[in-house]
Amino acid sequence: LHQPKLLLETCSLSGQRLTAGSDYELELQLKNKHTTRKICNLKVTLASEENSLLPETSSAYFPEISPGGTATVKTKLHISESAQQKSTPLELQFEYEDDKGTACTGSEKTLLQVSQPVGIQMEGFQLADTLYSLDTVSGTVRVLNTGKAPLYNVQVQLQVPGLFPRESVFAGTLEAGQTGEGSMNIYVGTRDMKAVGESSQGSDEEKYGLVEGKLVLTYEDAYGETYTQEQ
């Protein structure tokens, strides 16, 4: 007689992106694949090789599973803050007996997608308090990846009425903890100008005076999701 075999049928967190440092409700459905023999005294143990997936309850017991029947393991799963951003295996170890009392073992594995939260800062950008029309000035900005995963296509743009950057600062890919730095040359026009080379017909009050604007930081994570941050 073939011994009854236990398989993992479904995992409630499969296909989801799990953020490091967060908690999730986990349900694992197990199925006895034998059509005529039951499984008895089943112990299920959950484990992660790198201790990055931490179940609140690491084991579960089921007195029996009927032929073709199922059992569901339910527990809260904590994702370690230090977990690497990657597909991480959650392992299930089975210890049970068949209906004749013969000891059996088995194992299953499911991959869970762990992601790190993004973190980024801009600093160091300054211009003189007074700028003169028709001048070209330069500004430098630093971008720091404060998270634990790479960021891609990191770019900073300046948006201020009357100031026209000749280029944006493109930092490209920033690894975790890495700093990117770049400068932009900025043409100083007038407050009412919409584009470089456009003649200004406004009064002095319309052309000159205080202006306010922002730096716009854009970047992508490893999954291609785009983020925007303003300062």
Stretches found by the model and what they are:
Residues A47-E56, D99-G101, Y152, V160-V169:
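Short aromatic-acidic-glycine turn motif
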Residues L1-L18, N51, K109-Y132, L163:
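Low-complexity, acidic Ser/Thr/Pro/Gly-rich terminal tails and inter-domain linkers that flank the onset
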Residues L1, E81-Q113, V188-Q231:
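Terminal connector regions
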Residues L42-L46, Q155-L158, L215:
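Hydrophobic beta-strand segments
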Residues T36-N41, S87, K148-N153, Y227:
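Short acidic/proline- and small/hydrophobic-mixed sequence motifs that coincide with surface turns
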Residues L54-E81, L163-Q201:
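Intrinsically disordered, low-complexity Pro/Gly/Ser/Thr-rich segments with frequent PxxP/GP/PP motifs
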